[in-house]
Structure formats: C-alpha cells, structure tokens
C-alpha cells in the first residue's frame, strides 16, 4: 500500500508534522512502514510556457521551441512528439542535475542552439505518465512562469509504503490510513463535502431503474454521468496513479481507480449505450447467488459479480456518452466463500473486497462526483439509486476495568471512549459500568473484548504501556486426598530405594501383645472380633512389623528390612497416620568387601536410612520400655517431636526370636514438608577446620550443637561430628572431633575471617566448660 504525504494532506492537516513522525506513528499503531522516500523534482527546473514551435530544418523529429520562463525566453530544441505552442511545460535550465545524473548545459542540436530541456515525468525522477514531455496544468496549483517546480507540493513530496496484515482491509486507502492517524495524532479528519445537486438537470430515474432481490449481502449506490466529449486525466491524478501503478489509458477507469485508492470504496462504471437501445430505460437486476454473492445484470447480459469481477463488455470506452457509476460493498466473508466458484476474477478488485472494502458508499461517491464536477462538458444526473441493507452489527459489552486487566495497567475511561469514537465505533453507555460497543462495518475483524483492547493499545502506543510480567494464576485443583497420595507415594519410593520392603497388615491387632510392648489400648473394644489375635484396633504399626520380621527370621532371612505406612488409633479412637521401619539382622549381604562376614546392623546405619527417607532431623534422649535404654532417642523436626527410634529391647528380641533389631515409628502428619527451601550455590571454595574437644561421659552433643547454631555465623556453611574416641588415659571423658566448613556466597574467604569465627566457637565451648584435647 503506497501513500504520499501530500495525498494524506487531502484528509488531514499534516503540514506541521514530519514524515518521520508519520512513519513512527504508523509503526506504533500496527501499520508497518516498509520504506519512506523523497519525491522531489531537481533544482533549476521551472514552469515554462511554449510561445512558439517551429520544425527543425535538419531533422524530421526535432522542433525548435521558444519557451517563456518569466525572466527570459529560452530557445530549446525538443524531440517530443506531443510538444506544441500554448502548453505549460517543465523546463530544466542550465545547471540542473537530472534524476539520471545528467547536467543540463547549453548545446547545439543539428546546428541550432538549445538552452535547456523540456522534461518528461520520468526524467524528473517520477513515474512515467505519458509519451513525450509532461504537460502542466493547474491541478497541481497556480502556474507561475519561472516558479521552481519543486515548490509545488506534488513535486516536493514524500512517499510512504506500508505493509498491511490481511485483517486490515480498512487501511487499503488513503482515507483508511488517515482515519487511524487522526485517532493516534488527535487530529480532525477532513471528509469530502456532500455533493450539491445542480438544478435543471435530468434525474437518474429517467434512464435507470433497479430491480433487486431482498436481503442482498451488500450495499449499492448508483449515479449517472453524461459525457459530451472524451475527458482527460489531469496531471495531479496522473502522477498519483502512476505512483501506485494504477494509471491506465481509459480516463474513466483512471478516475475510478483514483477514487478507490483515496476512499477505499469499490467502483464499477457501466457503458449504458453498450447494452440498451436509444431512449430505452436501463434496468439493472441484482440477484443473490447460491454462495451469497450478488450478480449484477441487464436483461440476460452479465455486468459484474460484486467484489469479484466486471464483465469487460460492460466497461466504459473513450467514446462512451452515458455511464452508470456503481459504488458497492460486499461482506468479505461472502467474497471468501464465493470467489473459488468463479473462474473469471479481477485480482485487484478481489484484493480489496476479500479483505473488506470501505462501506461508506456515499463518502466515496461524493469524492468521485467532486472530481467529475471539475471536468467541463459533463453532466451529472441528479439524485441516486441506492440499495442499503441494515446489517445487524454484534454488540460487544466492555468495561474499563476489563480493558485495564487485559492491558496490564489502568486506562482512563474518557481516553478509551475518545479513541473508540475516533476509530468509528458506536458506543452505548449502560448501567453497572458497562459499555456496549458496536464495531464499525469496515472492521469485520473486531469480534470481542480482546480485539477492542488491541485497538486501544494501538492508539495509546505499545511503548506507552508499562512492561509487566504476564501472571498466570491457575486454580489449585488438587484435593487433600491426592496430596496425601503423592506424599505417601514419595515416602514409599524413598524407603524402597533404601532397601526396605513394604509390609501390609490389618488395622486390627492383638491387644495382649500391644500391652506387653507398652502401648495403650483403645477405649472402645470390638464387640465381635474376627479372631482372638485381632481383637482390637492397633495403636502402633510396630507389633505387626515385629511379627513379620520374626517370621522372616525363622525362614532363615539374614537381612530383614521392612516398613509399613498406614492408620493407627489412639486411646480415644482417633485415627492417625503413621509410618514405621524395622531393620533386623545383618547390615548387608556377604560379599568380597566384607570378606563374606557382614556385620550386624548398627544404630548409625539405621539412622542414615531414616535420614535418607525423611530428611535431616535432630535426636533427643528418650525413655521407652520397648527400646534398649542405651540406644534410643526421640526424633525432632523443627523442634517438633515426630516419633522415636532405637534398638529393640533385648528381652523382646529374645521373646520374638529376633537377631539384633532396630525400629522407628513416625507421625506422618508431622513429617510432611509443604515447602522447599532453595538456596543458591556458591561458586567460591570452602575452608574447613577441625576441633577435637574433651567432653564428660553423659554430656549431650546437642548442647554443643545448639550453642554453635545460636552464634548465627554467616559464613559457617555446616558442621558435623566426625569422630568419637575414648581410652584409659581419658578416664571419664570422650574426645570428639567436629568438622567445620566455611564459605561465602559472594567472595573467597580469607584466613582471618575463618579464624575470627573459630575464636567465637572456642569461647562458646569454654562457656560450656569444655576444653580442647
């Protein structure tokens, strides 16, 4: 789509606005500018008048012209066949540099002095409009002899070529582009004045009648023109049409092409004399076809299919005397469906109608008649014949809040309404903050709130919308049952990965066995138990696991690692979720690394398994009758007791015929982790330090751990107990070794920083009464 600034000036006041700003504005409102170029005549090319023309004595094709340029009369030898006395022409004077780089100099042509050149449009750097030289007329402005040609707007213009998306058929005209620019630049759109009918002229009803079916998928407006002589296309229209490759040999077709490119309205011109007899009334039949398109015909002769093609036999000719001008609009969806069924197609017409031509037929017709009105020896028949169907436009309810939510920032209501009105939308204010919007007929692509938001953003400017991350808020569709399933499944997977087999048992248990293990019974007893061994609801998972382990041991299993996840009941018959583990027998299978003599499971081994399954935890001393008094502890997560762990009491091991056995039971509801704590990794190296400390026997390591943690040393990454040592020389003391790791997230640590932290740790240990070994 090609436009020029001067052409836009016909619709908008753009004298004070640069082409660069116009291009930037078009880009910002979604009309992509491909290129901007200057259209300027060379300097030292002026308006001249051919006073006299005589034939060159020594040439059949050359003429000697006396050309008045105001300040002087130049003798110019010209070879153009169309030059003649009485013409206004473009004269390149001495020193002018033409578009091809040629400099005009005084010269002799076949022995005759020539002091300049009469120019064609092509020689001036414009598109070719005719054979020979370019003849000037006052369509470009008042002709003044000697006036530089590039002081006329058409010869000092700027061309802008834009690329349009298929949905923007409304911008396939100067008027359509100007309409969007008016909204973006807050300018008033200049529309053509309504055509004023002349008095004492025949009405169109004398020569034309319409016969139309109801419910046509289009709009139609007809006018009649009487021609007394062949008309010519003026210079302004010729230059503009040549720029858009729309200049032809037929002047009527040229005027229609110009009006279409200017307004977007589609036109057809029918030669009345080609079909009807003299003094016969011309009846145009409009009929709706099977695919929705409209057939325009006269008797049995096809004139056109609206928006698809026009029959060549119906077109106007240079000698046409009466022509019927048809302005038409067809729903682009109808064109899209129907065009594939027509072998004959007008590609230029289809390009517009398929995307949506301008439906304001009166605007286009008034514009065209305004051009015809300036042509002498021409009669415009009064009145018009029209077929206007009321198409019900869809109503789109919108709210300013809804628009603001989609755009991502608050927008002013008055600004939104102003933009939509400028773009031709019909607005109906309703209650509760809603606005009912009807998209104009020239915007069939506007169908919902999002489309309207896009229009608002286009005009406001995407660069004026604050950047904001798109936030997706999805409703949580996971219920508690599914969450429990996933959490329990993950626990099972980790337990299996640690070598444990899952065991499943009834929720019923043996009340006597539970009592011997030290577990309370539920208050409510079973009235009719299945068996004597299953006579109560279980209060722990461990009894079943011990029985299962005992059975496995009796079947010569050397490594017994079992777990069970399920429900238990407290003394008040409330259901609780628990998970229990048991590791009985050997630590591992016999293999080369242990010389086929694997050790029995140790407390530390069992603790590592539980850590791998539930994560880090703390231990505190405990007292359970079911456990060995020397190897047992309560398990804490975030200072909350979640269960216990330890070695099964030797007495119970013997009663159940079990080898060395460790057990653990945890409250599932307390070990859940509803969130993950993520920390960045440091790319800098760690520095380690070890301390060996003497502690009295019976002194809890947790006291040391808690005191060090309370120091809140920023660079202390972690610390752990790595060794416990005792011998006769230490008597009532143990020697423990603690390893400390220091690291900074932002830089490499220096020794003095680490030493400072170690001094604080040593002072803390001294406050506990502990000394270095």
UniProtKB/Swiss-Prot annotation:
Location of the protein in the cell: Cytoplasm
Family membership: Belongs to the phenylalanyl-tRNA synthetase beta subunit family. Type 1 subfamily.
Name by which UniProt lists this protein: Phenylalanine--tRNA ligase beta subunit
Gene3D superfamilies: 3.30.56.10, Bira Bifunctional Protein, Domain 2 (3.30.930.10), Ferrodoxin-fold anticodon-binding domain (3.30.70.380), Nucleic acid-binding proteins (2.40.50.140), Phenylalanyl-trna Synthetase, Chain B, domain 3 (3.50.40.10)
EC numbers for this chain: 6.1.1.20
Domain named B5: residues: 391-467
Pfam families: B3_4, B5, FDX-ACB, tRNA_bind, tRNA_synthFbeta
Residue sites binding Mg(2+) per the record: 445, 451, 454-455
Taxonomy of the source species: Bacteria, Pseudomonadati, Campylobacterota, Epsilonproteobacteria, Campylobacterales
Chief localisation class: cytoplasm
UniProt cross-references to PROSITE patterns, sorted A to Z: B5 (PS51483), FDX_ACB (PS51447), TRBD (PS50886)
Sequence ranges assigned to domain FDX-ACB in this UniProt record: 682-773
Subunit (UniProt): Tetramer of two alpha and two beta subunits.
Enzyme class (EC, first level): ligase
Catalyzed chemical reaction(s): tRNA(Phe) + L-phenylalanine + ATP = L-phenylalanyl-tRNA(Phe) + AMP + diphosphate + H(+)
GO biological process: phenylalanyl-tRNA aminoacylation
Gene from which the chain derives: pheT
Source organism, top-level taxon: Bacteria
Domain tRNA-binding: 39-150
Keyword list, A-Z: Aminoacyl-tRNA synthetase, ATP-binding, Cytoplasm, Ligase, Magnesium, Metal-binding, Nucleotide-binding, Protein biosynthesis, RNA-binding, tRNA-binding
Cofactor, free-text remark: Binds 2 magnesium ions per tetramer.
Cofactors, names only: Mg(2+)
GO cellular component, one term: phenylalanine-tRNA ligase complex
GO molecular function: ATP binding; magnesium ion binding; phenylalanine-tRNA ligase activity; tRNA binding
